[in-house]
Amino acid sequence: MIDKKISPATVCLLMTLWMILAIIIGFVIKSVVLVAVFLLPVVVYEIYRTKGEFTSLSSWLMLAVLIGELIFIIFGINYNLAEYFGSQDAYIAGQYVPLGDIKILGPTLMAVFSLVLLVRTYGPYTKWLSVIIFVSSLIIIYILNPNAFQDLLKMVIHNNSFNY
């Protein structure tokens, strides 16, 4: 549909510029909601682009997590998953994911799902979109809680989590 009117490269370039704008404004005004809302069309286009069984599932899960993340942030829902599960991390989709405030888990899961797409998709545009989503997810974590961002990086380095 959209690819017949506008080339995927043009759409991905526009999505990249769109998210750069969102990240800059989000940093300046410290708004996670702004970055997350701007990320919605990127994730929706990723869903449109993915065709495989697991990649489509990963794309749809990202959308569900992003919508959940927006609900948690807008309504100020705080829940400490580490206390609930009695563990500081969980092994999800082949990656160790830190547990803590549920609002940090959402973008962390999105980063993991985007890495799954980066590795499992064949198309250059779905890979491009997955990188946009990955970077945006990390930015969301950083704006939410810079300390949680540092902890996530330490965990990744310590566990070598993203070694495919």
Across the structure, where does each feature detected by a protein language model lie?
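Alpha-helical transmembrane segments of polytopic membrane proteins
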Residues: 30-40, 92-109
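Canonical alpha-helical transmembrane segments
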Residues: 38-62, 113-115
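Alpha-helical transmembrane segments
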Residues: 6-20, 62-67
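Transmembrane alpha-helical segments of multi-pass membrane proteins
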Residues: 58-73, 130-141
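Short, aromatic-rich membrane-interface segments at the entry and exit
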Residues: 27-38, 55-58, 125-131
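C-terminal TM-helix exit segments that contain a strictly Trp-centered aromatic cap at the helix terminus
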Residues: 67-82, 140-152
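C-terminal membrane-adjacent module
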Residues: 102-164
